[in-house]
């Protein structure tokens, strides 16, 4: 598993439904070279993939009944292919792991402004070259991507179970790669545990930055990665200027530092002081308090990303906007939730986007979210994974 903020709750649930100390947890990546930044559990060992410490921490793979892979990215493809034949391997789906490498999925993932930023950023770090040399490098890069995709194809072919709550993503994967994997329902905490937080942030400075009387608030995205298409989202939100008194809260506590810096600069030029970059890491209680008090959630990703943001927004009775191509939009629609597509509501004059949901719709959305992502269902799903 990588070092991430929601894995402690997963570990707590797994330990509660399985035999005590029956599992071994290895974090193969952290932003900090020698410590875990987000995971607090003492059961987790930090050992970078490929290091001696990693293979010592894992030990003989044959001793395990099953192996859970959190975020199946390139290094984990290699690890999967090194495991004994017949090993039960569980892929705990994140979204970004399927759409890797980004170069292969670039046309789908990134809209025009974001794609241009990435191209310009790449050009800035490359030295001027003669056209024939540039062509050779492009061919080498294309060959490298082809080899990576072959590795990915083989690794996905070894997966026994895909653990995820959205069948639409499962169908995308099985249509793109040959695999006999079965779908097991699964979602990460804190998708289900909104009730356990007090939700009242004591950070008065943060409240003052984010909320003011008579000012509507938009929560944009969930992180500082280009897959959020924030640069294109700014253009979508621009027509609101002069029509509404609003503020855009943008979670940027983790992501690509260069992209975050560029985004803040660009947003300042378009939205001025309406843009509030949240570059600090926010504890769960504070973060969900922001979601509770914002007016609308604006998700401009083309893929599954920020599911907990969307689910929390729906639980709190907020309007949540997606692109129609996003499988989260389709998932929520299919389950009877009232969500809105950006293409319809933010076209032309972009009117009535802040209109509050009727009380009965808020109540229905909250009820359905609790049915889909309840504490009991989370434990049931993880127990099924442990026993399967």
Regions found by a protein language model. Name each.
Residues 5-9, 225-239:
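A conserved mid-protein helix/loop that constitutes part of the nucleotide-sugar donor-binding site
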Residues 66-68, 83-133:
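Active-site proximal beta-strand in glycosyltransferases
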Residues 134-185, 381:
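A short, active-site helix/loop in glycosyltransferases that binds the activated sugar's phosphate group
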Residues 368-388:
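C-terminal alpha-helical cap of glycosyltransferases
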């Amino acid at each position: 598993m990588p070092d991430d903020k929601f894995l402690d709750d997963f570990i707590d649930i797994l330990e509660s439904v399985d035999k005590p100390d029956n599992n071994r947890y290895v974090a193969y990546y952290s932003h900090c070279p020698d410590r875990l930044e987000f995971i607090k559990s003492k059961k987790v060992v930090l050992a970078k993939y490929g290091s001696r410490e990693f293979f010592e921490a894992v030990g003989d793979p044959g001793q395990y009944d099953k192996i859970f892979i959190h975020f199946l990215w390139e290094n984990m493809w290699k690890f999967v292919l090194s495991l004994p034949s017949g090993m039960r391997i569980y892929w705990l789906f994140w979204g970004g792991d399927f759409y890797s490498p980004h170069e292969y999925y670039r046309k789908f993932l990134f809209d025009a402004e974001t794609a241009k930023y990435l191209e310009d950023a790449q050009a800035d770090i490359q030295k001027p070259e003669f056209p024939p040399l540039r062509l050779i490098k492009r061919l080498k890069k294309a060959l490298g991507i082809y080899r990576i995709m072959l590795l990915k194809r083989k690794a996905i072919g070894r997966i026994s179970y895909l653990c995820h709550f959205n069948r639409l993503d499962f169908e995308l994967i099985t249509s793109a790669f040959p695999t006999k994997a079965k779908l097991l329902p699964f979602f990460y905490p804190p998708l289900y545990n909104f009730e356990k937080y007090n939700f009242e942030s004591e950070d008065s400075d943060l409240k003052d930055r984010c909320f003011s009387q008579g000012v509507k608030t938009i929560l944009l995205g969930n992180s500082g990665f280009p897959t959020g298409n924030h640069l294109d989202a700014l253009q979508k939100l621009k027509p609101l200027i002069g029509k509404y008194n609003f503020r855009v809260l943008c979670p940027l506590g983790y992501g690509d530092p260069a992209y975050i810096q560029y985004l803040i600069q660009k947003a300042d030029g378009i939205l001025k002081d309406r843009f509030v970059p949240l570059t600090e890491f926010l504890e769960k209680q504070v973060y969900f308090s922001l979601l509770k008090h914002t007016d609308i959630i604006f998700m401009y990703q083309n893929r599954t990303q920020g599911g907990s943001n969307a689910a929390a927004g729906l639980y709190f009775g907020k309007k949540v906007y997606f692109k129609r191509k996003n499988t989260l939009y389709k998932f929520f629609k299919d389950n009877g939730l009232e969500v809105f597509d950006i293409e319809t509501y933010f076209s032309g004059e972009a009117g009535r986007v802040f209109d509050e949901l009727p009380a009965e719709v808020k109540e229905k959305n909250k009820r359905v979210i609790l049915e889909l992502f309840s504490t009991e269902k989370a434990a049931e799903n993880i127990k099924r994974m442990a026993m399967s």
